[in-house]
């Protein structure tokens, strides 16, 4: 019986190591191979090979499909900027801390459950109209410049320090949900009347110019050094 169990365990181990990550986009696949992650030189990426990667940059390749990226489950840093992506699902990359996905054509972005994400760059995608960052509780830096967001919920982002959201269609935002924020660039949005920045004691830089604000209440912004409105 013991020998049978050992055989079964060994067979399962071999199967796991032999499983191949399906990567339909040839440019995506070839870059991963060119970076040296195909350790057994079979022109495929095994699950075990993908799981050994912690940092991956696939920028400037005209990639259109990122299917297979969720097989790289130990990634902490991912760069897919300057491609032709229309969708990006990285929801299985639970260890991800840095995501650089700017200058694509992304419309559908799934970053659900990335509770370790600290830096998110999705600027210049044009088609992003909604962005759910409410569960990204350790996020420190957020850049969504040059998209089409009309609203953004910052609930729970208690360590967020930097927001870049210039050239969107934001009509409202509650910056007080991000009490540690230091730098805010929300130039050229559609804000009206005012934005509540009261009590943001760490705020040092604020740009909300290009909107139709009537007034700002600077109460409590004791470290504010530079502002434009």
Feature annotation, model-predicted:
Residues 1-20:
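Bacterial Sec-dependent N-terminal signal peptides
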Residues 61, 83, 104, 125-126, ...:
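Consensus "Asn ladder" position of solenoid repeat domains
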Residues 183-190, 198, 204-210, 214, ...:
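Eukaryotic tandem repeat interaction scaffolds
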Residues 14-79, 94, 115, 137, ...:
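N-terminal capping/linker segments that flank leucine-rich repeat
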Residues 53, 75, 85, 96, ...:
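Conserved hydrophobic position(s) of the canonical leucine-rich repeat
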Residues 54-58, 78-80, 97-101, 118-122, ...:
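Conserved hydrophobic beta-strand positions in leucine-rich repeat
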Residues 69, 77-85, 91-105, 113, ...:
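Right-handed parallel beta-helix
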Residues 64-69, 88, 109, 130-131, ...:
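Canonical leucine-rich repeat
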